[in-house]
Amino acid sequence: MLKAYKYRIYPNSEQRIQIAKTFGCCRFVYNQTLAYRKEIYEKEKKSISKTDCNNYCNRELKKDYEWLKEIDKFALTNAIYNMDAAYQKFFKEHAGYPKFKSKHDNHKSYTTNFTNGNIAVDFETEKIKLPKLKAVKARLHREYSGQIKSATVSQVSSGKYYVSILVETEHKELAHTNHNIGIDLGIKDLCITSDGKVYENL
């Protein structure tokens, strides 16, 4: 079972610059691949896949705009996949055509994937390790157990930064007792079960 844990982070000035660059580059790649997809469809009446768009980014965009190489590759790939999801929703659910992203959006975010320990949460030092950022100070108010799958870094309109850690946790099923029970909700008591147990109102 996948579960997300959201924490506030406190990046230093250097980390804030890198985060801002990542926001901007993800927006740029989203817009460029959306425009590329639209151009191919208008010229050739052919729909291309998210893999085609990702290849276009790696072979063309990173060649023409070398500063994209300074950004976490998973963040750029996920920006393309988000564009593809919006594009697929347009055709399957007749939603509005995907819009180009603006740098003036109040909510900014990017997602990176876990691989080879590139994301780690240290509850003792209250720091989170993230690609290209190293260790970021965080308020780790809630612990978890499980395997990290991804991390989404975001900045809200107030300027605060957050990271949402997606974790795969173990799903524990309750033992089957083959015992049925009825529950009578009451006014004086919260409920009375068919086996005679009374739960009082708090």
What are these model-predicted stretches?
Residues M1-L202:
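Nucleic-acid substrate recognition interfaces
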